[in-house]
């Protein structure tokens, strides 16, 4: 028992457990990555900067190379093509399968792949609940003029003190990992 939801044009997947728990796209990517890497070990798996910090270690643990990239459908799709990665995804729910598919985002296909993975389990709910969960700051958008975003990020890097930060990432905006 699982709930699958699709956006209006069918290119994004939403997942809800039988208990009503939302399985956010970065957690969906964990299942997809483990499955794909079983057939394509050592390959890069692309994810956008909005995904939580739990995804990269999961990809490594399952034999892949995590590759964080900029947010945006076209940007992720271009990176998939550039790298030849078998899988990419965004926190928005866009999942791009190159392995056994055509390299574009298709929510219905992603749903079918998820059902294929879960069909191998005795209890799908147990599989979904076992995925590591994490909290993250939602995307913050500030209205700005052309050129201002990069200047703001530079200024934040100069003036802000991110006490205890493990890493500061500026691939697309500002991401601080602790």
Q: What kind of region is each of these model predictions?
A:
Residues 1-16:
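N-terminal small/polar loop signature for handling phosphorylated ligands or for N-terminal nucleophile
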Residues 6-8, 22-27, 101-106:
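Short glycine/threonine-rich catalytic loop with a Thr-x-Gly-x-Asp
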Residues 8, 20, 28, 50, ...:
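Short, ordered loop/turn segments at secondary-structure junctions
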Residues 10, 22, 91, 95:
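Gly/Ser/Thr-rich beta-alpha loop segments that engage phosphate groups in nucleotides
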Residues 12-29, 55-56:
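Short Gly/Thr/Asp-enriched flexible loops that form oxyanion-binding sites at enzyme active sites
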Residues 26-44:
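Ser/Thr/Gly-rich flexible loops in soluble cytosolic domains mediating phosphotransfer, phosphorylation
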Residues 38-178:
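Phosphate-binding and adjacent anionic-ligand microenvironments
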């Amino acid at each position: 028992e699982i709930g699958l939801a699709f956006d209006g044009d069918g290119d994004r997947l939403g997942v809800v457990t039988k208990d009503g728990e939302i399985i956010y796209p970065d957690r969906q990517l964990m299942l997809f990555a483990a499955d794909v890497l079983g057939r394509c070990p050592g390959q890069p798996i692309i994810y956008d900067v909005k995904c939580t910090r739990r995804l990269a270690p999961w990809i490594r643990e399952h034999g892949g190379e995590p590759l964080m990239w900029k947010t945006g459908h076209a940007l992720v799709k271009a990176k998939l093509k550039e790298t030849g990665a078998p899988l990419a995804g965004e926190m928005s729910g866009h999942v791009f399968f190159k392995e056994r598919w055509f390299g574009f985002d298709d929510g219905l296909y992603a749903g079918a792949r998820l059902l294929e993975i879960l069909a191998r389990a005795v209890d799908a709910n147990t599989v979904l609940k076992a995925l590591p969960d994490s909290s993250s700051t939602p995307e913050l958008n500030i209205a700005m003029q052309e050129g201002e975003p990069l200047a703001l990020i530079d200024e934040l890097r100069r003036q802000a003190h991110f006490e205890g930060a493990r890493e500061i990432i500026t691939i697309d905006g500002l991401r601080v990992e602790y």
